[in-house]
Amino acid sequence: MSPTDPHSLLGLSPGAGEREIKHAFRRLAMRWHPDRNADPAAIEHFKRLRAAYEDLLAEYSRCPAPAAAPHDAQAADARPEPPPEAPPRGADRREDLVLTMEEAFAGGEKAFTIADEIPCGACGGSGEEVLRHTRLCATCHGSGRVRDGRSLTACADCAGRGYLSRQACGACHGSGQARAARKLHVRIPAGVLDGDELRVAGADEDCDRSGGEPGDLILRVVLAPHALYRLDGRDLILSRPVSAFRMLLGGELPIPLPDGVRHLKLESGRATTRELRVKGAGFPGRGKQRAGALIVRLVPVLPEAPDAEILALLEIAESRLQNTLSRHLPDVASWEERWLPDIPETR
């Protein structure tokens, strides 16, 4: 339709009735009448609107719209309308759910916030806002036409009207959408691992705009790095410094776990780096997967800068060890027996 066509100027479709023609002209006249619009180009545009209005009224008076034939209406009523199709189900939405080692170990409920896209409150989701005063289209300078090669075509920016009554919404920048935070409470099973997926059925309201069933929210578990623990499958591994004397003496050793403290029995006799392994005491089992083992790497530590009292006690212990060297320190005894007896002392 040409931008100079009377129907186009008044924003009407071909075949519009007298009432529609008058209503369209009154609406546009309120906007473009020189007494209401200070734009210098408003006078010429108003003249074009009046001319289009008069042409359409004259045409309508000569050729009024024909009334619908009765048999046509009956035929239309006789055709049953097909049932409306059910709106499609919304697509599933995927997000990452970051958990601490303690949260994944014990399970429970965790608050999770997601950002939904909702219709912009400023423009109602249209992406446009109505201008307080219409203005000439800057692309076609109010003519409604632009040159395309050797011909003139309707201006796409103003739909051939020559003026703009709307502009992109300043709040959503024309997208029609806004972001809104929504909080969910997600149940976390005990023993979830990095990469596991949790499905929250029907929780993706962001996909439920067409009236169909909302999609699911799928949360991929991401375990945050921990300063103490690491995982090998479901085996829970940690290193624990221990006094070398405690490793010699043995006894109970407190071990921190994600859900509390557990006391392990430490066998006496060796002050070397070694591992304690407790089957089933690691990460909890889930489904068909069994619980892992707790693996504690014990690292012996000697005292730094011992005071006089500790040195005296150590001297007593060392003297007694020297008396039973072959029993308690066999490596030292064999070495001294091999290399010391026949070597004369030097001054």
Swiss-Prot record:
Residue intervals of the J domain: 5-75
Keyword field contains Nucleotide-binding: no
CXXCXGXG motif repeats: from-to residues: 120-127, 137-144, 155-162, 169-176
UniProt keyword terms in alphabetical order: Chaperone, Cytoplasm, DNA replication, Metal-binding, Repeat, Stress response, Zinc, Zinc-finger
UniProt binding sites for Zn(2+) 2: C137, C140, C155, C158
Subcellular location(s) per record: Cytoplasm
Cofactor-binding details, from the entry: Binds 2 Zn(2+) ions per monomer.
GO CC terms, sorted: cytoplasm
Cofactor: Zn(2+)
GO BP annotations, alphabetical order: chaperone cofactor-dependent protein refolding; DNA replication; protein refolding; response to heat
Residue span of region Disordered: 68-91
Record function comment: Participates actively in the response to hyperosmotic and heat shock by preventing the aggregation of stress-denatured proteins and by disaggregating proteins, also in an autonomous, DnaK-independent fashion. Unfolded proteins bind initially to DnaJ; upon interaction with the DnaJ-bound protein, DnaK hydrolyzes its bound ATP, resulting in the formation of a stable complex. GrpE releases ADP from DnaK; ATP binding to DnaK triggers the release of the substrate protein, thus completing the reaction cycle.
Domain notes: The J domain is necessary and sufficient to stimulate DnaK ATPase activity. Zinc center 1 plays an important role in the autonomous, DnaK-independent chaperone activity of DnaJ. Zinc center 2 is essential for interaction with DnaK and for DnaJ activity.
Quaternary assembly: Homodimer.
Family, as annotated: Belongs to the DnaJ family.
Protein name: Chaperone protein DnaJ 1
Species, as recorded: Aromatoleum aromaticum (strain DSM 19018 / LMG 30748 / EbN1)
Encoding gene (name): dnaJ1
